[in-house]
Amino acid sequence: MTPSPDSFTTWITGLRKWHGWLQLSAERPYMHSEEAYNSHYGVAAVETREGEGFCNLLQTHQIDTTGPALEIGCGTGYLTCGLARHYPGPDYLITDPSPTFLRLTQDQFGSNFAGIARRHYAVFNADDVTLLPTGMFSVIGLRSTLHHILKVEDFIAACARALRPGGARVMGSEPCETGFLLMAAVAQSIPSTLKAAGIEMRPEWTYKLNDFTSSVQFYCNRDIDKTYGEDKHYFEPYAMARLGETHGLKLEFLPTGSFQDFAPPYGNAFHCFSSFFLMYLQFCMRFDDDFMAQIRLHLKAQLKFIDDCYRSHAGPAVSSIFLFKKTPGATS
């Protein structure tokens, strides 16, 4: 049974208030500096195309948008601003376990911001998703968030329960296992490639390289405790499809897709493997400029080989979109 239009208002009005925020969970700061997050990833301006593309994707896949939308893990609002401007439903609940991230996101909205949906902000940890009312939301959106969640299967089951039939849980910028494993395999060839070129690995280069490859191994492993890791998982589309099907969710997998691909001018944010690989090492892993210059120069052949394998189709799947639509009649 679909909740009445007033049920969201009744529920959200009854939530506890804490330091100006609605509160569903205890606060939890991000493991690194929230204030420095955008500069760390090279984000210099407010992004609107991600949210616009997200909403266009909903329309393309005929997702019900008559009910509220929920964003889990807004971070600095990379998805939020455009989604708030273009979401056609009545309400938009913006959440993060970090009050600092909520403030950074809220600060993007001026008094003259154009958007239909009413915006609400709540301190909320994704691990508490079972607290959400059954059948409340038309859309649950996440960008670069699922891999932070410890119990993925429980999370997907709880999201399915909180969705209306015809609604969707849409996740973007989520890491795919095979693509990142390929990146780590290429990275492991860096020392021998540089040695063959007469370049000696510096101790700080070895440290950063080992940090990357050991992180990939940590995320791939499924037999260790990941409770205290900030990032925890990589994903495999076939396993995700089976998991979604168990809970009445049909998966549409968009390999290498980014939400902004579905907004004007409708380009592809993912250009090729080599571009993503080099960007990731530079901005995410913080390889220094000298190290990056040597990698660009001496790994050209390896990177070109992979790019040529995907010269006419998208791939390999590294960072992708997972859209789960709740099928009519599903009761999970």
Protein language model features and the residues they cover:
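Conserved Class I S-adenosyl-L-methionine
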Residues: 234, 238, 252-323
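Class I SAM-dependent methyltransferase SAM/SAH-binding core
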Residues: 78-128
